């Protein structure tokens, strides 16, 4: 009788221990079942299978300053001045002016690392907020091609920019292409990135423009990228870079390849 009671107590003890262990394990089991594994998350599109690599850090600390040019309209800009490998300010190898597309501002070039990269490579980099974008107010005074040309001229003259390389993506072609037509001799180089407005230039006008040009567009940009490429290759002094796997804003999809092509082009100009 005593042995029977002892055995029963042992069994009850084991059952109680198993119950306690199961209770303790249930929260982690429930949590694990609710959260998909990294592999499952990648299949579900909850996270990128391969995150884009960050831009390589510059070995030199670059300061990007901001300014506001008075006038109608006032123009906000960002500037990175060229420095040597020790971080000392130097005379620029070239001056570069960067415009932007409709969904972007001058801050895009700062966040992408383009301004710092140019400055650490010896170039003065100026990025402009076009009227109605970023910190530059809109204005009725820039509704014609000539008024937009005058705006760029005012910006360049006020900041002492002479013979710059002009970079123009997408929407900013409304400013850059008329300027190129009228003042191509004032540009040391031109970098169109699938700009609008390329159909408004005649074959003869293209032929007369001798400015060295780097045409950049994304492989997947079959609309404006392909259309602008077809027109821009009429420029007699051009080079083409097509960024594989990149969309309309190809510099955002492939920043390293974009920067490499840009620096290579600039190195052949100075």
UniProtKB/Swiss-Prot annotation:
Membrane topology: Single-pass type II membrane protein
The organism of origin for this protein: Danio rerio (Zebrafish)
Family membership: Belongs to the AB hydrolase superfamily. ABHD14 family.
Pfam families: Abhydrolase_6
Subcellular location: Cytoplasm; Membrane
Active-site residues annotated for this sequence: 170 (charge relay system), 221 (charge relay system), 248 (charge relay system)
GO cellular component: cytoplasm; membrane
UniProt KW Membrane keyword: yes
Alphabetized SUPFAM superfamilies for the sequence: alpha/beta-Hydrolases
Transmembrane intervals: 9-29
Listed EC numbers: 3.-.-.-
Residues modified by glycosylation: 61, 237
This protein's UniProt keywords: Cytoplasm, Glycoprotein, Hydrolase, Membrane, Signal-anchor, Transmembrane, Transmembrane helix
Job description of the protein: Possible role in granule neuron development.
Listed name of the protein: Protein ABHD14A
Record GO terms (molecular function): hydrolase activity
């Amino acid at each position: 009788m005593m042995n029977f009671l002892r055995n029963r107590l042992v069994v009850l003890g084991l059952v109680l221990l198993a119950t306690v262990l199961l209770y303790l394990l249930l929260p982690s089991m429930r949590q694990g079942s609710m959260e998909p594994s990294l592999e499952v998350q990648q299949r579900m599109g909850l996270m990128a299978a391969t995150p884009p690599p960050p831009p390589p850090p510059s070995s030199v600390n670059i300061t990007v300053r901001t300014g506001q040019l008075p006038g109608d309209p006032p123009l906000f800009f960002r500037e990175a001045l060229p420095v040597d490998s020790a971080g000392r300010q130097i005379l620029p190898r070239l001056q570069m002016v960067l415009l932007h597309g409709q969904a972007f501002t001058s801050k895009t070039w700062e966040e992408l690392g383009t301004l710092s990269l140019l400055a650490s490579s010896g170039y003065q980099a100026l990025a402009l907020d076009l009227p109605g974008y970023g910190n530059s107010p809109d204005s009725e005074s820039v509704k014609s091609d000539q008024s937009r040309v005058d705006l760029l001229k005012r910006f360049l003259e006020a900041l002492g920019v002479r013979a710059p390389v002009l970079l123009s993506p997408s929407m900013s072609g409304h400013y850059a292409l008329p300027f190129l037509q009228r003042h191509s001799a004032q540009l040391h180089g031109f970098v169109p990135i699938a700009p609008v407005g390329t159909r408004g230039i005649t074959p003869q006008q293209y032929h007369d423009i001798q400015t060295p040009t780097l045409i950049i567009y994304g492989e997947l940009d079959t609309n404006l990228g392909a259309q602008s490429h077809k027109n821009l290759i009429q420029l007699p002094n051009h080079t083409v870079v097509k960024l594989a796997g990149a969309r309309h804003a190809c510099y955002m999809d492939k920043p390293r390849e974009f920067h490499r092509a840009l620096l290579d082009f600039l190195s052949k100009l100075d």
